[in-house]
């Protein structure tokens, strides 16, 4: 009896200590909404960083907490102002009220800023108006981009320079500056150098007619950390290449040169000494030297007369067989070649010479040119699988006794190690 009593007491104790089943949630509890406003601001901030500005603005209206996150400095480091006139552009512009709010509440937070303007003078003026108000910010990058014609050039030079100088003076750590197609001049570049010489790493200023060779030389002499530079050929000089090759200067990584002629016979193109190129490539052996040519045939005489360290060549107008032949002889570092037009004389010998001497060539594009199918196959065979980009219009290839258009893609594919077809001209 006692044993039985003890067993009974033990069973009762175990039942008492057993976990009670959870009470199911009532319908009222299940339907109670979550309070999203109580999310940690760090979490909301992380989500907001992935949202477009318009969606972020809508989300900021959910509650006071989210609105506070919307105005946090981290979300306003980078901004692109899009300035367009409805009458001349179909692109959506940044709302004027938003621009006012940014200048009022976030101008001191901005660090990475770009302006995209359409072809109207009014849009360029609006960009300058915003620039002139950025007196409390220190930008790291600035880009002025004309999406159509260069509308900044329509402004009075003094008005543009005044606005740009505000940024140069107040930004003490500017590292990237893109001001192509603008009326920037030598004195404004001196202001840039005086305030940002230790930090400037990238400068793109193609088609800036008010800058002289002395002006860009001042930048190269003082900005020893400059790694990327884009300019027009008339600003290139032996002195500039030697300044970029000095012991104080870091190794340049990218140099783009635009060689442009608007009026045939009226533009004089000077010659750069071979010794200057040699010093430049010795100092920066891995530099990408990109050259865009928009010249008429008779204007190529000063170019490709001796070896130059060009890696990327783009010919935007018709270029003669003779010039392309000289390219094969003088550009051993060539990586990419694009020829928009040549004429009706086949480029067989020129392509073979380029394949023989340009051992790093990995990309080629041919537009309105002519090449025999046999020469093209031989060219691909010599280059082999290193041709990662091969863009040739079908009209360029001329069938011969050895290959037809139907046969050539098999032969080229075999040497490339991948399936290849010539580009087709759209029929619409």
UniProtKB/Swiss-Prot annotation:
LRR repeats lie at residues 119-146, 181-207, 208-233, 234-259, 316-341, 343-368, 369-394. Disruption phenotype: Mice show defects in behavioral rhythms with an extremely long-period activity phenotype. The onset of active phase is abnormally delayed from the light-to-dark transition: in constant darkness (DD), mice show significantly longer rhythmic activities. Mice lacking both Fbxl3 and Fbxl21 show an attenuated phenotype in behavioral rhythm compared to Fbxl3-deficient mice; however, they exhibit unstable behavioral rhythms, sometimes eliciting arrhythmicity. Residues 1-33 are annotated as: Disordered. The keyword Nucleus applies. It is found in: Nucleus; Cytoplasm. Ubiquitously expressed but enriched in brain. Diffusely expressed in the suprachiasmatic nucleus, SCN. Undergoes autophagy-mediated degradation in the liver in a time-dependent manner. Changing residue 358 to S: In after-hour (afh) mutant; lengthening in circadian periodicity. Its main location: nucleus. Keywords: Biological rhythms, Cytoplasm, Leucine-rich repeat, Nucleus, Repeat, Ubl conjugation pathway. Pathway: Protein modification; protein ubiquitination. Pfam families: F-box-like. The keyword Repeat applies. It comes from the Eukaryota. GO terms for biological process: entrainment of circadian clock by photoperiod; proteasome-mediated ubiquitin-dependent protein catabolic process; protein destabilization; protein ubiquitination; regulation of circadian rhythm; rhythmic process; SCF-dependent proteasomal ubiquitin-dependent protein catabolic process. One of its GO terms (cellular component) is cytosol. InterPro entries: F-box-like_dom_sf, F-box_dom, LRR_dom_sf. Substrate-recognition component of the SCF(FBXL3) E3 ubiquitin ligase complex involved in circadian rhythm function. Plays a key role in the maintenance of both the speed and the robustness of the circadian clock oscillation. The SCF(FBXL3) complex mainly acts in the nucleus and mediates ubiquitination and subsequent degradation of CRY1 and CRY2. Activity of the SCF(FBXL3) complex is counteracted by the SCF(FBXL21) complex. This is F-box/LRR-repeat protein 3.
